[in-house]
Structure formats: C-alpha cells, structure tokens
Amino acid sequence: MECVQTLWLSLALALARGSWVVRGHPQPCGVPTRAGASVRLAALLPRAPAARARVLAALATPSPRLPHNLSLELVAVASPTRDPASLARGLCQVLAPPGVVASITFPEARPELRLLQFLAAATETPVLSVLRREVRAPLGAPTPFHLQLDWASPLETILDVLVSLVRAHAWEDIALVLCRVRDPSGLVTLWTSRASQAPKFVLDLSQLDSGNDSLRATLALLGTLEGGGTPVSAAVLLGCSTAHAHEVLEAAPPGPQWLLGTPLPAEALPKTGLPPGVLVLGETGQPSLEAAVHDMVELVARALSSMALMHPERALLPAAVNCEDLKTGGSESTARTLARFLSNTSFQGRTGAVWVAGSSQVHVSRHFKVWSLRRDPLGAPAWATVGSWQDGQLDFQPGAAALRVPSPSGTQARPKLRVVTLVEHPFVFTRESDEDGQCPAGQLCLDPGTNDSARLDALFTALENGSVPRTLRRCCYGYCIDLLERLAEDLAFDFELYIVGDGKYGALRDGRWTGLVGDLLAGRAHMAVTSFSINSARSQVVDFTSPFFSTSLGIMVRTRDTASPIGAFMWPLHWSMWVGVFAALHLTALFLTLYEWRSPYGLTPRGRNRGTVFSYSSALNLCYAILFGRTVSSKTPKCPTGRFLMNLWAIFCLLVLSSYTANLAAVMVGDKTFEELSGIHDPKLHHPSQGFRFGTVWESSAEAYIKASFPEMHAHMRRHSAPTTPHGVAMLTSDPPKLNAFIMDKSLLDYEVSIDADCKLLTVGKPFAIEGYGIGLPQNSPLTSNLSEFISRYKSSGFIDLLHDKWYKMVPCGKRVFAVTETLQMGVYHLSGLFVLLCLGLGSALLTSLGEHVFYRLVLPRIRRGNKLQYWLHTSQKIHRALNTGPPEGQQERAEQECSGPKEEQPAADGAGRWRRVRRAVVERERRVRFLLEPGEAGGDHPWLCSNGPGVQAELRELELRIEAARERLRSALLRRGELRAQLGDGTRLRPLRLLHAAPAES
C-alpha cells in the first residue's frame, strides 16, 4: 500500500514538471518575480466560497513588521481544481518566485494532506496546513517542513482528555469501542503511547452487519459476568457520529463506565435511552477559522523575526525553489533554518497558547467540559457538568462531589439532599428545640458554626444516631422553610438542613467564595434556601432557580423625638386658618352689633331701652367666649337675627375647636423627625457630612451592588456595616444611635419596620436595584429546571401569595389598636408655647392697665371738652357713661367742697343737709339712666353745679313744674281707669281719688 502511494505521488510530481516546461500554468499566479525589501508568505485558498471569504478577511489584517526593515507580504493564490497534479503545479508556481519563504494551505481531504507533506519534504520549504480533524490521519514519520494546525480538536488532544479521566477515576482495564476509524491499529498505538497501557479489549464495530442484534452480541462481551464483576472498568467510544453513538449506548449492557470520545455540543446531548453515569466530552470556546489563520501568520512572522536577528543574511536573501531541479539545500539553507525556528516558537495568540510539538504539530489552547448523565430527584435523566479540561489539566467542579450518584435501576428510595440556609426574618427563623432535641413545629436544623466538610459529615452522621449535642440542634421555620417543605413533598425527596457556618450570603474574598456560595461550590450542600439574592457575580459560579420573591434595595432610618417649639400648639391649624378664624370672629361681632342696633327689639336705647346696651365690645366678648368655650357673664343679642347669627357662630366654633383638639394630640405627641433621604443618589450618601454614618450587611448583595456602582460610598460605609440584618437594625435603634441609615433588601426592612414595637423605624427614598430571591444550586445541577418549574406552578396557583400573606401580614405602625392602659401623655415641653403665651398675656395686661389710666386721665378729658365723638353707646357703654355723665364721685365731692367753701362759713341747717342728700340721690339716679335719653335731652341745661350755688331756686321751680305735669297726667289716667271699671261693674273707683286727693295735700 505504501508503495502505491509513493508511486502516485512521484507521478503527480512528474506531471507537474512536464506541465511547467511545456506550457506553464494557464493563469498567472500574481507572485512578484523579484525580491525586494519584503519576504512573502503564500496562501493557497480553500475551495469553498464561504471558507475562502473568511480566510481572505483574516489575511487582510496588517502583517507584523520584521527586523532590518523587512516586511511580510501575504499573497493569496486560488487553485481551480483540487486533483493531485493541479495541486502540485499550483504549489510549485507559488514557491518558484524569489522571496517566498513559506505557504499556508487548507487541505480538504487526506490525499491532499499526503501530497502537501510529500512536496514540503521534497522542496524543503515550510508548508503550514490548517485542517479539520476529519482530514487527520497517521502520515508516517513527521517532517519539520510540514506543520499542521488542527482547527477542530485533534485526536491526540481528545485522547489526552480521555486518558486524564481514566487516570482520575483509577480505571485500569479499558475497552476501546471503534465505530468508523480508518487506521484502528494506529489509533490503538496512539492510545497505548498516551495512556502508557494497552487497552484490554478493542471492538471494531465498522465490520458489523446492520442491526441491533449483532451490535448487542458484540457489546455483550463488556457486560456483567456471572460472578457479578465486569471484564473492564470503562469503555471508550471513539469515531462515532451522534446518531451512531446513541445506538451503541442504547445497546450497551450494564456494567462498565462509558465514555463518549466524540466532542458534542450541549444541545446535541441525548437524555433518553443512555446508561446512567455516561461521560461525554464537549469542547467550549472552539477557535474560529480567522483566529487560526491569524495565529499561523504570526507564527511565521515570529520565526522570521528570530531568524533575522540571528541570521540576517539568510532572512534577507531567501532562495527560490525550482521543482524541475530539486537540490538539497544543506543544513545552512534558509528553509531549514526557518523550519528550525518554527519548531521552537511559542506565543499567546488569538486561539490561546500556541506552540509546536514534535516539530510538526501546532498546538493551540483547548478547553473541554465533562458532562455526566445523572438523575434528578424525580428520577428523570439530566446532564450535569462534573469537570473541565484545559491545557492538560483536569479539574472537577467543586459541586460535582455533592451531586447524587445515580441510584441503581429499580430502586424506589427517596433521595436525600443537604440544604444550607441562613437566618433572615421572616424567611428563616430559629428557636431552641424541646427537651428531647426534636421540633414539634418547623424543621430540625443544625447550627454547626463551621464550614468544614468533614465536621459537617460527622455531625449529620451523629444526628442519625441521636448523639448530636442539644446546643447544636435548632428548629427552623419561616417563609423559605414552608416553600422547601412543599417542594420536598411535590418532588419526593428528603432533606437535611443546616445553618451556614460563617453566617454570610457569599462574596469573593482572596480568590475564594464565602458563605452560601462557598458551601455550594465546595460540595457541602445540594442547594441553598433563604433570602438568596440573584446577581451576576453569583450567577457565574452557581445556578439559581426562577425567583420566588421579587424585591429591591431600600434605606431604613430611625425617627427621633424632638422638643416642640414655642409655637407648636398652633401646628394643628395652618396659619391661614388662624387668620381666617380671628378675621371671622371680628366680622361676626361687627354684624351682631349692626343687626342689634338696627332691630326694633335690640338691646339699645331705641329698642328695649333697658339699663344695659349691646355694644361692639359686648359682641367681641360674646364671640371670644363662644370660640374658646368659656362660661362667663356676657350680654347676648335680643333680636332674632342676632340670635341666629350667634348660633351659627357657635356651630362654626364647635367644628373648628373639634378639629383643633383632634389634631393637637397627633401633632404634639407624634412630633418626630427623621433623616430625609431621596434614594441611593442622595447627596447625603455620596458626600456624607461629619458624623453621618450608614452601612449594610457584609458580603450581601446590597454591599456588592454599592461596591460595583459607587466605590467611594462603599469605602465610607464599609467600617459601619454589620454582620447581619438584626445587628444593623440594633445599631440603628441604639441610644445613642450608631447608624443614621441602614441599606438592605427592602423586603427585610419592611418586616423590621412592621415588627417595631416603638414605631421608631421607617423606610425612606425610592427603591433601587430590583432583584429577586432564588434557590441556589451548583452549576448544571439537574435540580435547577425541576425546581424552577414547580416554583412557577406555585406562583400560578397562588401558593406564593399565601406564603406572603402568612409571613408579611403585620399591622404597620400608625394603624395599631393600643391597649386600654396605654395613653399618650403630653409633657410641659409639648405645650411650652401656651405657658409663654400666658406669661406674655400677664405682661400685656400691665400695658392694658397703663392704657386705661392714660385714656382716663388724658384722652377722656380731651374728648369731653370737645363737641364731637360724644356718642359711644354702640361701641362701649363704659366710655359713653364716662363722657355723658358728671365727674366721678371723688372728683364731684372735691368740687362740692370747693364750691361750699370752708366749713365754718356754711350753716349746718337740717333742711339744707336733707336737701343736699336728696339732690345727690337725684344726681346718682340721673347718672344711671341719663344714657337712655336722646342726645338733645340728655344734654339739656342743668344750671346747678354746686348744692349751695345761686341755681337752687331755679332748680326747685323746674322740679315743681315737672311734678305738677306728672300729676296731671296721672290724674287723667286714673279717671280713665275708673270709667272703664265702672263699665265693668267694679266698685273700686274711690281708690284713685284718694290718691289724687292725697297728692295735692302733700304738695
């Protein structure tokens, strides 16, 4: 066979030489014919249009500069056909012009690859082939002039991954199951060299007849033996397509661990009909064709740069290649030197780390995922990531060890999951267990206080034996515990619960995750159930279910009782209301006075003509008495209109006073202040003043958000943060408070506000950073999809709403019904303004008294001496009396003494003394009733001023005339009454006559 291939290649080379001599290439290659200040790298383009366009786009990028002012020129050449003769002619034409140091090719079939390797070795010119894995085949001894870069995963790399898995599981006896492999013996040899151990069985399925019977019969050799053992530990399936691999795995007998060696994408992984625990490889981040071409060009450029620095004469004068006269260039030729530098070049390219292994294989960085077929708690198959392989290093996922190993077929045992939680009200509460260490209500959970996996395993083992100390036993209950119990019931699994050791949600510290995230990554728990916020950083390392609770971040502050200012008693009513009330009072008093004086029945001289008058001052006194509800003696209006207006004013005052009284207690007792924050963008948070402190919970989602969004704010609040939410609330409510504001999940803050007995807490500002709570699981856990599905069902059925109503239906502050014994007390500081007002009233009373004396001694005499402003009865009865009567008693006595002269000059006659007393009585009576007369009558001429003056005789005559006139009127009235009684038959007519006869006799 090898001889036939050699003859075929020789014939192709001969045809190429003949064609070169006779007529040359039918189309010009476009390669420059002379060398200049540049070296050339030729590229034989692929035949497929899409691949050709991608290669041209990659070659269009600027080429790197070389030392000594050299430049690398890229020349693209397209060959019309891909037969061996045309390929040989095209390659010879590419290499013929001077300056071409290497070429890049894209073989699409194995014969092309063999021809390129033969031509590279024959012409001693480096040829770099970018190929797919399907083109690869053992080509005999490698040559340094033909370098191969596998765009897809090379077979050697896949075998390295499989060997790493075999060694990690300590599998000794291995069986190779081959589907369609062109050189099975070469593959077995390659496996033996990589694994350092030959496989125990090699099953070639390519020679089998079509049908499942023959396939099952062949694979039965790997099944379980009669004694219960298996002939091999693992079976590796190679060279199979996705459909063929599915057929083989469906027919595989139970027993060995199956490994699928063909890399598959995640979406192509089947789930049904496969044996549990089968391992599958999946390449992630496969390099693109453009990246592979770019790295090949950079490989040549770096090798040329190194060669130009060490051997500039060879880099500046590359020799031309003549396919008609092939001569060995010797060890010092440019091609051999470049090949040597190519095999010793390595760098970090677009595909990752690039290096040449074995002088002909160009390796790039590869990354594989290892997937395993597991079973979820419902028993359904699901793929889970158990490890990853990169650059020869196999790493198992941290949570892979925690995943449940598939139970044997036919078992019905309920799986048992380990759940980690964190105490956060109202989602998770804890209380002490009973005397027996059990929980009548809630779920038994451990509080180990450590994150050590061995310690946890030992405690749960001791829990089954009943030997765990009671101090570590707790009873967990709450929102999330109810949700977990419902999930366990619907998904048919059991769980064991423990509280996270460090009490943290989880953050990246010194390259390691802490808290709940750390427990999931370390495999200590299958899931984390609490108020676990979903954020981008956590989602990169663990999986989350769909959120079962939506929330955001909020700010909580504390209210403070402050001393009421002096004018606090006026707060129940707005200043405009106060002005309106007193304006209405004076206006009502004015209308009461007008209605009373214009009414024929009013308490005025023209109305009822009594001893009292309803003036404006009386109306003001009445309106103030009604407004403040004081019971004092006051004049009331007598006219119906005035009475109606007075009652209407009383209704107005009742409503105003009731509103004032109702609001007074709320305003005075509820006088509280708090930090007004508009939200996370408030200047108080971004530029805090001296003494303003705020914080959050360490390693929580709130801290992660603030740290990523506002680094300066996080630097200030870091030293004021708390380990837990209750601790932060305690810092906020302490006396004196250690925090002015506390930032955390709004759902947690709302609960703390609702249970605050003193009503000192409240949330302020706009919510921000909308987030949700989900159940955390290891990456690619088979539980994620099932849990998310059931959570969605709970939302639709209303179960989530029932949980919210159960744990969040608290009575908020301001709407609570206080106990009978609980009273709202107001101290002196609440009504300090009233005391100040009373003191001001006492001071103003002194000023009023001073004003009275000023009016009495200065203003009143001036008005009395004038002729105007003598009628004040409608305004004030007191002022009117003072103006329209004689001098006061003291002044009158002094005036009488002045008029009478010395005592010894006045005779003390009894008649004169008696007459003086009568005169004084008349004067006093006149002073009491004189205001009832008209102004003209009241101001009549009374000539007497002194009792002993010259006007006594005139006064006596006037009095006698008045008495006589009165007697005449009385006599006429009595006569008329007698006539009327005579008509009625009354015999009492003589009585008035005696009165009339007695009157003249007395006179």
Curated annotation (Swiss-Prot):
Signal peptide (UniProt feature, chain positions): 1-24
Classification via Pfam families: Lig_chan, Lig_chan-Glu_bd
Residue ranges crossing the lipid bilayer per the database entry: 575-594, 642-661, 833-848
Disordered: annotated segments: 883-912
InterPro entries: Glu/Gly-bd (IPR019594), Iono_Glu_rcpt_met (IPR001508), Ionotropic_Glu_rcpt (IPR015683), Iontro_rcpt_C (IPR001320)
Coiled coil: 947-986
Keyword annotations: Calcium, Cell membrane, Coiled coil, Disulfide bond, Glycoprotein, Ion channel, Ion transport, Ligand-gated ion channel, Magnesium, Membrane, Postsynaptic cell membrane, Receptor, Signal, Synapse, Transmembrane, Transmembrane helix, Transport
Membrane topology: Multi-pass membrane protein
Keyword Magnesium assigned: yes
Biological process per Gene Ontology, one example term: protein insertion into membrane
Superkingdom of origin: Eukaryota
Residues that bind D-serine: 533, 538, 701-702, 745
Annotated Basic and acidic residues bias: 891-906
UniProt keyword Transmembrane, yes or no: yes
Chain residue ranges for the region called Involved in the trafficking and surface expression of NMDARs: 952-985
Membrane-side (Extracellular) residue stretches: 25-574, 662-832
Intramembrane positions: 616-627
Membrane-side (Cytoplasmic) residue stretches: 595-615, 628-641, 849-1003
Tissue-wise expression: Expressed in the facial nucleus and the ambiguus nucleus of the brainstem, pons, medulla, spinal cord and cerebellum.
Substrates-to-products reaction catalysed: Ca(2+)(in) = Ca(2+)(out); Na(+)(in) = Na(+)(out)
Function according to Swiss-Prot or TrEMBL: Component of a non-conventional N-methyl-D-aspartate (NMDA) receptors (NMDARs) that function as heterotetrameric, ligand-gated cation channels with low calcium permeability and low voltage-dependent block by Mg(2+). Forms glutamatergic receptor complexes with GluN1 and GluN2 subunits which are activated by glycine binding to the GluN1 and GluN3 subunits and L-glutamate binding to GluN2 subunits. Forms excitatory glycinergic receptor complexes with GluN1 alone which are activated by glycine binding to the GluN1 and GluN3 subunits.
Name of this protein: Glutamate receptor ionotropic, NMDA 3B
Name of the coding gene: Grin3b
